[in-house]
């Protein structure tokens, strides 16, 4: 019996088998959780439903949801409530900024509209999901989980306004933890090392970032979606019942280093 047996989880943000959300879904399924999913638009519906079936779910537990639209978020929980009488876990794996914001000098390329979009989709949407799912999760010792990156606290080439949005997201983790803790709901984030996903492909020179990270991380390798998925499943389980408001780094130790190995090491 897995450590998530009996838990019900809504996973928001599965886009491909290579996405971090997929790694989390696979780990949660392995550990016995019952899963529901959202998809952004009709173009992704068939793909997400196919993935869901592989993780023990079914099409009626896959719901349309553009996280920029509060009415769609509320509709997800209204529909989910017809199938489940409660919810234990929400996984938020959503991040977006216009492509022109992720290419070039931060001061030069950042715009008011790009800033707004990045924060709305990448940070506020987590709060919106928590707000809409609050009643279904109340009193169940449940967990909210989101995904961040070290660019929230350190500058990264071309990450630009997404770094600011992730910083906002991490602050949201702490404030949500304070807001929902008395109801038994924990809130945490996994800060993953760079992984080749669809979202990451929009960042200029991402392959160079991967190579640099591999050289400089203590483990001398990049992490996988399976490793991030395992950490996410743990944080959402009763094994982590005393952890809330935290950012868990799954980056091979990169966040602990000030200087990577020298060329002659």
Swiss-Prot record:
Described function: Catalyzes the reduction of a carbon-carbon double bond in an enoyl moiety that is covalently linked to an acyl carrier protein (ACP). Involved in the elongation cycle of fatty acid which are used in the lipid metabolism.
Active site annotation, chain numbering: 149, 159
Enzyme class: oxidoreductase
Coiled-coil regions listed: none
Species the sequence originates in: Pseudomonas aeruginosa (strain ATCC 15692 / DSM 22644 / CIP 104116 / JCM 14847 / LMG 12228 / 1C / PRS 101 / PAO1)
Cited PANTHER family: ENOYL-[ACYL-CARRIER-PROTEIN] REDUCTASE, ENOYL-[ACYL-CARRIER-PROTEIN] REDUCTASE [NADH], CHLOROPLASTIC
Name by which UniProt lists this protein: Enoyl-[acyl-carrier-protein] reductase [NADH] FabI
Binding-site residues for NAD(+), renumbered to this chain: 13, 19-20, 40, 66-67, 94, 166, 195-199
Gene transcribed to yield this protein: fabI
Lineage: Bacteria, Pseudomonadati, Pseudomonadota, Gammaproteobacteria, Pseudomonadales
Pathway(s) served: Lipid metabolism; fatty acid biosynthesis
Positions contributing to substrate binding: 97
């Amino acid at each position: 019996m897995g450590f998530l047996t009996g838990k019900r989880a809504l996973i928001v943000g599965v886009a491909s088998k290579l996405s971090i959300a997929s790694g989390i879904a696979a780990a949660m399924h392995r550990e016995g959780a019952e899963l529901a999913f959202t998809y952004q638009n009709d173009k992704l519906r068939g793909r997400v439903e196919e993935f869901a079936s592989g993780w023990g779910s079914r099409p009626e537990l896959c719901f349309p949801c553009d996280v920029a639209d509060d009415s769609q978020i509320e509709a997800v929980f209204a529909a989910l409530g017809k199938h489940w009488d409660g919810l234990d876990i929400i996984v938020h794996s959503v991040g977006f900024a216009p492509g022109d914001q992720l290419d070039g000098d931060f001061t030069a390329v950042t715009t008011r509209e790009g800033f707004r979009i990045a924060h709305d989709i990448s940070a506020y949407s987590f709060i919106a999901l928590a707000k809409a799912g609050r009643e279904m999760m109340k009193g169940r010792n449940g967990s909210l989980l989101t995904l961040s990156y070290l660019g929230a606290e350190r500058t990264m080439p071309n990450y630009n306004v997404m770094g600011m949005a992730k910083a906002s997201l991490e602050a949201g983790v702490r404030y949500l933890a304070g807001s929902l803790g008395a109801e038994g709901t924990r809130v945490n984030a996994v800060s993953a090392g760079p992984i080749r996903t669809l979202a990451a492909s929009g960042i200029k020179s991402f392959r160079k970032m991967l190579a640099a990270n591999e050289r400089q991380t203590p483990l001398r390798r990049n992490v996988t979606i399976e490793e991030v998925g395992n950490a996410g499943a743990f944080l959402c389980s009763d094994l982590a019942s005393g952890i809330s408001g935290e950012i868990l780094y799954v980056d091979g130790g990169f966040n602990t280093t000030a200087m990577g190995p020298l060329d002659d090491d």
